[in-house]
């Protein structure tokens, strides 16, 4: 399958309470061969993510689970109600199997445990983007 070079870039929202993690994910997206991705927002918590998602209609979201105001679990539910076709990749330090399974049952399409390598994140993002 040849991607259409004129196709609209896939909109990505990065959600994490750590500025360092938001910056790292952004860097991987911008420098890691994910050419057809447009970063539409950076959110520090779930409540901010919902506000940004309403305005930007992202197709893919990277989501931390442990955040202030609204955690990732609540945010996944809100985003799926708002945008039922959204694809969510959980990126979390809560790396036990039960956490990953719970996130997937909520509707996330993938899970990457922190700390992660750039390659692991890139591959997980590609998998989630292909699922759309």
Regions found by a protein language model. Name each.
Residues 17, 114:
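A Lys-centered signature of the CheY-like receiver
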Residues 56-62:
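Active-site beta3 strand of CheY-like receiver
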Residues 64, 92:
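Active-site residues of response regulator receiver
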Residues 67:
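Receiver (REC) domain active-site loop signature in two-component systems and cognate sites
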């Amino acid at each position: 399958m040849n991607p259409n070079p004129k196709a609209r870039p896939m909109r990505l929202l990065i959600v994490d309470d750590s500025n360092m993690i938001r910056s790292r994910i952004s860097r991987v997206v911008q420098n890691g061969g994910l050419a057809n991705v447009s970063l539409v927002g950076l959110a520090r918590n779930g409540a901010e993510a919902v506000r940004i998602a309403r305005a930007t209609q992202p197709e893919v979201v990277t989501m931390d689970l442990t955040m202030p105001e609204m955690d990732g679990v609540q945010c996944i539910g809100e985003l799926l109600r708002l945008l039922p076709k959204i694809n969510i990749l959980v990126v979390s330090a809560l790396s036990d199997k039960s956490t990953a399974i719970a996130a997937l049952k909520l509707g996330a399409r993938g899970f990457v445990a922190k700390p992660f390598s750039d390659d692991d994140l890139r591959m997980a993002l590609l998998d989630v983007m292909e699922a759309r």
